[in-house]
């Protein structure tokens, strides 16, 4: 509950207590009769007297039975006889005639009896009342005299004073005009008021104390929160993760070119913009705290870079397969301009706002709104937000003690953490059999083998590695090769539960196995970052995800989308969304050209590549899906054959023995069960070099080059022809798999 809610509740309670304390509990309010009544007839008067008498008798008996030892103040109604009897009584008593006339005049102007009012009141005990009522009306005066002689009401008042209670009213009636009774005394009303006032005072004090206590806690929490934010800012500043600039107020209010995102597609778009507009001023808004960098080396080349001292790799430099060395970042920090100086730079350039996020894009007004509400207008805008790694629901909702041992793999910070754990010889479990999961498992196995590290496990639900990309037979062969490299592959399994002990995680699998691991790395794909779609009113594809764009990669006028977050239309393969490095480069470049006025359609068939250790490397293009029918043609290598470099083609390969095999698989074949995967190369097929064709309606829609490099251009040409081939072996010869 908030502080304002507590205060409102306290005020309401005090108000109700005050109303209750000042309210008087009154008896039935006497209803006055009209000022004039018709004279009562004798029959009516006699009947009324009889009913009144019996009512009083029953009430007195009830009071006597309920409180037999109490003396009460009793209100006794007048026993005035009817008119005839009154005249007789007057004559017998010797009352003058003028008094009778005066009484008759009075009876005509006012009613003889008023409900709730008493003309004659006496204070007697319950027994006296019974005796007086049983007597005749003519003897009522002696009874009253006897009651007055005994004066029990005076005794009752004296006892009430002795017990510190307030006496009855002066006329002997009970409080509120009732029939009397100790429980209805005015003293009880005063006690009730006093208790209500004390309760209200106590509630006021308690509410004030509660408000003070909660306000104090809020102040302390706000102070602690501010202190934590300051410590986090200092930590990020030391680690190089501080926002740049420190405040969004330092960002320009208007830029010609605005890019949302700081990945490969964003930087590729900047290069295209700068190539077509030499003085272009580009502002890049990134939610990361680093300059733009490439992601593929995080799961491949960086793990094969020698680092004897296990120090953090400077600039994340790595060796390519060609032997040259380069950095993970596209450009050094000196290449970029400070956002504060972007408007003053005549030659233009690119400025990166690090650590900021965009929550809304108004395509009609050409204004973007940051999370803190700061607005920036633009002329041309590109959304290149990429995608975010998925996590297993069971691990995502786990207790904090378990989450400390669970991580995803996406950024250089994840690489640093995992490399440190591997250097400490910790056991690592990788969940997933896709590109990142399989590549990372092979890289960790190589690192562990070179440094005498811990065990590397790979757990996934499918039958074998890369089962969604490779045909079933090739997927099983790849799994065998990975196990030969030192990866403990556990297919057809998933994590049922994860429990933290003192140091490790105890993983219970659905196949009955139990693993003890120091860390779990989740690599189960990613989802496009489309949080902007709702506030910005942009369309998102329901089945594929990503922002829906046209052929020019335009979501709205002057608003483009590129990279993993774009869902584009392929004239040959239909609507697609691709999560590969080459697609990010090409789509970003095309979007940048269109932002400068080119207006070119996206017709490029992007490619991808992967490396699974020193013996397996492949490239693919088009629609590479294991659920499609496939035809594979392979050449068996010699014993002395070595791995071909990814970036250069070997034309001197000596292949004394070649064998061409054609294999066609269907969707059901790709899902065939594999109970056990052997790691013995003698028992598994040996697939050296080859090409795999993926067919749809007897047309080639995808090509996978197995240990063949620098032939992607030819594969792209074959796919773009969009034709049927009678003999795919003849098509395979174009790739020179035996060269």
UniProtKB/Swiss-Prot annotation:
EC number(s) per entry: 1.6.99.-
Result of knocking out the encoding gene: Loss of zygotic expression results in decreased embryonic cell death and the persistence of differentiated neuronal cells along the ventral nerve cord at late embryonic stages. Embryos that do hatch undergo growth arrest at early larval stages, accompanied by mitochondrial respiratory dysfunction.
InterPro entries to which the protein is assigned, alphabetical: AIF_C (IPR029324), FAD-oxidoreductase/Apoptosis (IPR050446), FAD/NAD-bd_sf (IPR036188), FAD/NAD-binding_dom (IPR023753), FAD/NAD-linked_Rdtase_dimer_sf (IPR016156)
Segments of this protein annotated with the region FAD-dependent oxidoreductase: 257-564
SUPFAM superfamilies in the record: FAD/NAD(P)-binding domain, FAD/NAD-linked reductases, dimerisation (C-terminal) domain
Residues involved in FAD binding: 261-265, 295, 300, 358, 410, 564, 580-581
Compartments (UniProt record): Mitochondrion intermembrane space
Catalytic reaction annotation: A + NADH + H(+) = AH2 + NAD(+)
Family: Belongs to the FAD-dependent oxidoreductase family.
Protein known as: Putative apoptosis-inducing factor 1, mitochondrial
Taxonomic lineage from the root: Eukaryota, Metazoa, Ecdysozoa, Arthropoda, Hexapoda
Encoding gene per record: AIF
């Amino acid at each position: 509950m908030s502080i304002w809610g507590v205060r409102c509740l306290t005020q309401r309670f005090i108000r109700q207590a005050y109303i209750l304390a000042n309210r008087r509990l009154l008896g039935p309010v006497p209803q006055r009769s009209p000022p004039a009544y018709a004279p009562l007839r004798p029959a009516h008067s006699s009947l009324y007297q009889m009913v009144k008498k019996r009512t009083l008798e029953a009430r007195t008996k009830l009071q006597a039975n309920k409180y037999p030892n109490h003396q009460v103040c009793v209100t006794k109604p007048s026993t005035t006889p009817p008119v005839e009897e009154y005249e007789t009584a007057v004559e017998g008593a010797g009352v003058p005639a003028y008094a009778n006339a005066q009484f008759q005049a009075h009876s005509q102007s006012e009613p003889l009896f008023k409900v709730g009012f008493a003309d004659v009141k006496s204070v007697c005990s319950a027994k006296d009342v019974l005796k007086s009522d049983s007597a005749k009306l003519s003897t009522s005066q002696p009874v009253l005299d006897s009651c007055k002689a005994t004066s029990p009401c005076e005794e009752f008042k004296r006892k009430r004073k002795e017990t510190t209670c307030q006496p009855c009213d002066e006329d002997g009636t009970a409080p509120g005009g009732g029939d009397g009774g100790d429980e209805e005394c005015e003293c009880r009303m005063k006690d009730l008021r006093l208790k209500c006032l004390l309760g209200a005072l106590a509630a006021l004090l308690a509410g004030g104390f509660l408000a003070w206590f909660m306000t104090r806690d809020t102040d302390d929490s706000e102070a602690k929160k501010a202190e934590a934010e300051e410590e986090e800012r200092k930590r990020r500043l030391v680690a190089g993760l501080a926002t740049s600039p420190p405040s969004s107020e330092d960002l320009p209010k208007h830029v010609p070119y605005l890019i949302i995102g700081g990945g490969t597609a964003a930087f590729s778009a900047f290069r295209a913009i700068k190539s077509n507009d030499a003085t272009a001023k580009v502002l890049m808004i990134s939610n990361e705290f680093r300059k733009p960098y490439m992601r593929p080396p995080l799961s491949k080349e960086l793990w094969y870079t020698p680092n004897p001292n296990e120090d953090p790799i400077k600039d994340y430099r790595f060796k390519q397969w060609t032997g040259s060395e380069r950095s993970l970042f596209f450009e050094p920090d000196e290449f970029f301009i400070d956002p504060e100086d972007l408007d003053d730079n005549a030659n233009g350039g690119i400025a990166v706002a690090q650590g900021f996020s965009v929550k809304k894009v108004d395509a009609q007004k050409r204004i973007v709104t940051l999370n803190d509400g700061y607005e920036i207008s633009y002329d041309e805008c590109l959304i290149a937000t990429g995608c975010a790694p998925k996590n297993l629901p069971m691990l995502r909702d786990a207790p904090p003690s378990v989450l400390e041992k669970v991580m995803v793999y996406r950024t250089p910070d994840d690489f640093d953490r995992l490399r440190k754990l591997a250097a400490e010889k910790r056991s690592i479990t990788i969940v997933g059999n896709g590109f990142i999961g399989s590549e990372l498992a092979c890289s960790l196995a190589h690192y562990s083998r070179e440094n005498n590290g811990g065990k590397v496990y790979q757990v996934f639900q499918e039958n074998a590695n890369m089962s969604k990309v490779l045909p079933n037979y090739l997927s099983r062969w790849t799994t065998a090769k990975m196990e030969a490299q030192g990866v403990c592959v556990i297919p057809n399994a998933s994590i049922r539960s994860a429990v933290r002990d003192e140091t490790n995680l105890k993983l219970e699998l659905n196949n009955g196995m139990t693993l003890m691991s120091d860390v779990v790395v989740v690599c189960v794909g990613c989802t496009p970052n489309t949080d902007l779609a709702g506030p910005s009113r942009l369309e998102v594809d329901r089945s594929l995800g990503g922002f829906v764009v046209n052929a020019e990669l335009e979501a709205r006028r002057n608003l483009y989308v590129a990279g993993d977050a774009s869902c584009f239309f392929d004239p040959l393969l239909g609507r697609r969304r691709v999560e590969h490095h080459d697609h990010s480069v090409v789509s970003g470049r095309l979007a940048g050209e269109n932002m400068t006025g080119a207006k070119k359609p996206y017709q490029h068939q992007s490619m991808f590549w992967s490396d699974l250790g020193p013996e397996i490397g492949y490239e693919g293009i088009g629609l590479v899906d294991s659920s499609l029918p496939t035809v594979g043609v392979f050449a068996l290598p010699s014993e002395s054959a070595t791995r071909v470099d990814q970036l250069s083609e070997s034309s001197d390969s000596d292949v004394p023995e070649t064998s061409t095999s054609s294999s066609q698989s269907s969707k059901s074949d790709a899902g065939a069960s594999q109970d056990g995967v052997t790691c013995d190369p003698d028992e598994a097929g040996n697939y050296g070099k080859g090409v795999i064709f993926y067919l749809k309606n007897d047309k080639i829609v995808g090509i996978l080059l197995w240990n063949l490099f620098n032939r992607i251009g030819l594969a792209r040409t074959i796919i773009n022809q969009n034709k049927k081939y009678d003999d795919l072996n003849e098509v395979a010869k174009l790739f020179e798999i035996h060269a």
